[in-house]
Amino acid sequence: MEKMMDEFKRKMIHDGKSDRTVEVYVNSVKEFFRWFYDSYGNVEYKKLYRENILEYKSYLKNIKKSSHSGNNLCPKSINSKLSALICFNELVEPDNIVVSKKDLIKIQAEIVSPTSITKREIEEFRQIVLQAEGCAARRNFAIVTILAYAGLRISECLNLRKSDICLESNQLRVTNGKGEKARIVIVNSKIVSAVREYQKTDRVESEWLFHNSRGERLNQTTINRVFKLCCPKGYEITPHTLRHFYAINAVSSGIFTIPEIANQMGHSSIKTTMRYMNPNLEEIRQKVEML
């Protein structure tokens, strides 16, 4: 099985999948094989069978428990595991396709609750990051600014290469987006200024825009630590909070069309973007008083 997993990993890397995707998919497929041998004993694995896929899907839906909550897996988690098997099937057993996207569970889109973080609080957080001690302050400030005002996923931000950003044209190129989709994101002057000032102090040779002192791509653990240290008391700000903030504010501004926001955020469907079109309760309250 090790040889097969090495082949799977190698082919994913060759296809340009991100390190995170490779890690998650490898772990998910290994989990399938653990279930396979637990279920069928010492029977030698030959190939994927449709019957096994359906039984595994039933196991995920009805028996498998979340390691975090102890409850049944949510549809999103099940789909993540099935997506790994779809990829494995396509890359390792391309002549034996027995699982596809049709097997994914349809998820009812939920309205995203309004963010409780205001722009003032985001700006306070950004300033704390900028004023933090250490040579990495400007780097971290640039990262936080991109997350808040371009809406990138943290993985997309940390995967940016220096060649991916063009300050003169106010745009950056995301090449390792979710689903491995590439896109161009237009950025504002806050981001241009933050990145430009960071680059003035960056003396390390590296292909990565955001890197450590050895020139290696920055990892998410480091950024999570920055958020924890700099987040004002009483606030709960994470990288995803900033992406959420961007989406809510882009939608509520009325300046952008939904397809424009979907492109900026890398949503494959505008239905995902429309989840952020929830009503502003304060505005409704004011309108009700006018009746």
Positions of the model-derived regions?
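Short, basic (Lys/Arg/His-rich) helix/loop patches that form interaction surfaces
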Residues: 131-134, 185, 204, 224-263
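DNA breakage-rejoining catalytic core of tyrosine-based enzymes
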Residues: 109-125, 179-189, 203-206, 220
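Basic, Lys/Arg- and aromatic-enriched nucleic-acid-binding interface segment
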Residues: 124-154
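Catalytic-site neighborhood detector that most strongly recognizes the C-terminal catalytic loop/helix
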Residues: 116, 176, 265-290
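Alpha-helix N-cap/helix-start motif at helix boundaries, enriched for small hydrophobics
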Residues: 85, 143-144, 151, 155-160, ...
